[in-house]
């Protein structure tokens, strides 16, 4: 927060001119760097690194030093910092979409070496080598983002698996295990996109509206705005969780949606794996998701290709149709291998009109998957036609 306020003051006081930290650095960085290095135990080493950085890359290095978390400023390996700046600037110079990025977008959404609070890895050069060939023929940000998103599973060899070692894995940790949580997968995608000059950021919610769990995903910036996507690409602004995101609660941290920012915002990103931490800067984006979800629902219904489908779980077949016999259960919905939705069914104390309902494309075969009372995976498969449909499952 202090450095954020310093920036506002310094922009007014030092609108032009050079920095005493070296040529290529605007003067308004001086008070920011002064504040960042004032109590840093290796300030001299960082100043030396800044002097040794090529002039064309020096502002990028200064920007990172100005906003780095104190822990990184004190301990992050300087060769990692140097490599990160070198490859980020190389990508900006090489790719046509990166050349036209506003400085503010490049600095905060391409340059940073971390997506959230993961271990700091030397991923930038490795990912540049992996993904630069994927975008060699692309001409726009959207084309390049889609090319990376479609190829990432094959190029990093990581799959979703709850047996992963920890939630917030770094790229190297995930690739070593060949598995990651949604958090680890999102870190991989953010870094892969950034490696070739594509603005990307980590997004998530501590819990959905029904408290059935947290989720993380990725946003990509193109055409002047943010678009959501996931590690397993199904299209931009298309995801199984959109209906849930549309029910997120504005201003309620436990059920809101946040995006990570490297630069301070005056707010923080809630880390479900480290609930007491305030170390990651964030910005709430709940309202945008609510508005997008509502507009998407109206569009799907107006198009006539989708129909409402409700799913209810009862204790036994004899309980069907009773309020008291309903069971709250987490449900995932698939069309073939693709997840198209998810939610939590209504329990016995909820209003009869309150239940798990989603829009599904007509003339499709869908599977509702949940765990029964014995902890066994249970599936109910139905054919969805032209009319609204109610589907039931049983715990016993």
Which residues are covered by each model-predicted region?
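Sec-dependent N-terminal signal peptides
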Residues: 4-13
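Cysteine-centered nucleophilic/redox motifs
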Residues: 13, 148, 178-203, 218
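Mature N-terminal, pre-catalytic/accessory segment of carbohydrate-active enzymes
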Residues: 20-33
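Secondary-structure boundary elements
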Residues: 44-177
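His-Asp-centered catalytic microenvironments across diverse enzyme cores
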Residues: 161-162, 195, 206-211, 216, ...
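Structured interaction patches on ligand/partner-binding surfaces of diverse proteins
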Residues: 371-396
């Amino acid at each position: 927060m202090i450095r954020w306020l310093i920036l506002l003051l310094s922009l007014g006081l030092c609108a032009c001119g050079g920095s005493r930290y070296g040529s290529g650095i605007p003067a308004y960085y001086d008070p920011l760097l002064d504040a960042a290095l004032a109590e840093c135990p290796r300030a001299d080493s960082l100043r030396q690194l800044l002097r040794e950085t090529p002039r064309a890359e020096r502002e990028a290095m200064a920007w990172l030093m100005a906003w780095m978390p104190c822990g990184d400023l004190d301990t992050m390996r300087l060769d990692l910092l140097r490599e990160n700046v070198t490859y980020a600037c190389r990508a900006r110079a090489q790719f046509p979409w990166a050349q036209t990025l506003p400085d503010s977008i490049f600095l905060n959404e391409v340059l940073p070496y971390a997506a959230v609070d993961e271990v700091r890895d030397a991923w930038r050069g490795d990912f540049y080598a992996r993904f630069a060939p994927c975008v060699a023929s692309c001409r726009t940000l959207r084309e390049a983002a889609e090319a990376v998103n479609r190829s990432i599973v094959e190029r990093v060899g990581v799959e979703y698996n709850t047996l992963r070692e920890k939630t917030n894995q770094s790229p190297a940790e995930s690739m070593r295990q060949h598995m990651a949580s949604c958090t680890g997968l999102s870190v991989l995608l953010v870094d892969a996109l950034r490696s070739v000059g594509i603005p990307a950021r980590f997004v998530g919610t501590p819990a959905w509206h029904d408290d059935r769990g947290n989720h993380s995903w990725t946003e990509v910036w193109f055409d002047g705005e943010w678009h959501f996507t996931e590690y397993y690409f199904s299209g931009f602004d298309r995801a199984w969780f959109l209906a849930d995101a549309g029910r997120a609660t504005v201003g309620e941290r436990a059920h809101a949606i946040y995006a990570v920012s490297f630069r301070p915002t005056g707010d923080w990103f809630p880390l479900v794996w480290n609930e007491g931490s305030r170390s990651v800067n964030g910005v709430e984006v709940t309202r945008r998701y609510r508005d997008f979800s509502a507009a998407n629902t109206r569009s799907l219904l107006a198009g006539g290709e989708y129909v409402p489908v409700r799913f209810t779980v009862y204790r036994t077949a004899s309980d069907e149709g009773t309020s008291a016999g309903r069971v709250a259960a987490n449900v995932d919905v698939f069309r073939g291998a693709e997840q198209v939705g998810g939610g939590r069914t209504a329990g016995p104390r909820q209003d009869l009109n309150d239940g798990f309902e989603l829009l599904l494309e007509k003339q499709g075969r869908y599977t509702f998957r949940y765990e029964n009372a014995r902890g066994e995976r249970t599936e109910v498969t139905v054919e969805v036609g032209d009319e609204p449909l109610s589907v039931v499952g049983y715990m016993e």
